[in-house]
């Protein structure tokens, strides 16, 4: 069995609105081995009585490469009502990732990061900060190519090189067996390959589309509207 940790937060809609509004105002200052389980986040004292916090830690059995996120996968759902998982793609990146880490720390909560391999190689010190803060680290290919436009072997190479690069950036530490496809495009042959590798696939329930919006308030309003509709879910954001 392969397993890794996802962080589920139980939040009220009003608390999330307040907390995310505060967060948005923070200025931005050869193939890999089979992934092993990510370390459990270290417990830390929270000095913010109004923080979002963490409701529970979910251990996910990744045997067979299950898919999560109702945008593409309907069979599995590990969240309870009023729980969300915060996920961040495309980092690590100076200013952006560090601002996200600061905001998460202020809210005493955790997230799942899906870094791009070459970005991790450029900024291993930031990658180590992500892991040291107790967040779960998966992978997001080597260079964020649309894998649906590559042949099968090139797609596998993108996946494996990305996993390896993140592991090296972490100081040759295991990478959690979680993967997100670039642009959320899932070639069937690579879905099958990840299943054979026992790597879980993360799609999303709520895409923030933060890369399309200039104002934090717009992102907050969009996410909260979707959260009010669905009541729970995996939220996709970016730290690049």
Predicted features along the sequence, with ranges:
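Active-site beta->alpha N-cap acidic-glycine motif
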Residues: 48-154, 161-168, 172-176
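Homeobox/homeodomain signature
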Residues: 3, 10, 58-63, 127, ...
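Terminal accessory/targeting
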Residues: 1-85, 102-111, 230-240
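Alpha-helical scaffold elements lining the catalytic groove of polysaccharide deacetylases
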Residues: 96, 145-171, 185-232
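Active-site-proximal beta-strand/loop segments in catalytic clefts of secreted hydrolases
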Residues: 88-91, 114-118, 141-142, 180-184, ...
């Amino acid at each position: 069995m392969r397993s890794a940790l996802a962080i589920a937060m139980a939040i009220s809609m009003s608390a999330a609105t307040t907390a995310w509004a505060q967060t948005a105002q923070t200025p931005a200052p050869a193939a890999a081995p089979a992934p092993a389980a990510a370390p459990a986040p270290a417990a830390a004292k929270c000095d913010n009585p109004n923080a979002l916090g963490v409701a529970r830690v979910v251990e996910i059995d990744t045997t067979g490469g299950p898919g999560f996120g109702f945008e593409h996968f309907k069979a599995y759902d590990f969240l309870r009502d009023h729980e969300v998982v915060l996920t961040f793609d495309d980092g690590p990146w100076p200013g952006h990732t560090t601002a996200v880490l600061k905001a998460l720390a202020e809210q005493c909560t955790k997230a799942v990061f899906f870094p791009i391999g070459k970005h991790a190689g450029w900024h291993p010190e930031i990658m180590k900060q992500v892991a040291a803060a107790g967040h779960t680290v998966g992978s997001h290919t080597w260079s964020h190519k649309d894998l649906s436009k590559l042949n099968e072997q090139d797609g596998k190479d993108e996946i494996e090189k990305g996993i390896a690069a993140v592991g090296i950036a972490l100081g040759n530490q295991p990478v959690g067996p979680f993967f997100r496809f670039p642009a959320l495009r899932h070639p069937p042959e690579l879905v099958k390959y990840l299943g054979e590798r026992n790597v879980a696939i993360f799609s999303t329930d709520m895409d923030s589309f933060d890369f399309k919006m200039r104002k934090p308030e717009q992102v907050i309003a969009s996410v909260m509207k979707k959260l009010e509709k669905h009541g729970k879910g995996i939220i996709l954001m970016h730290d690049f």
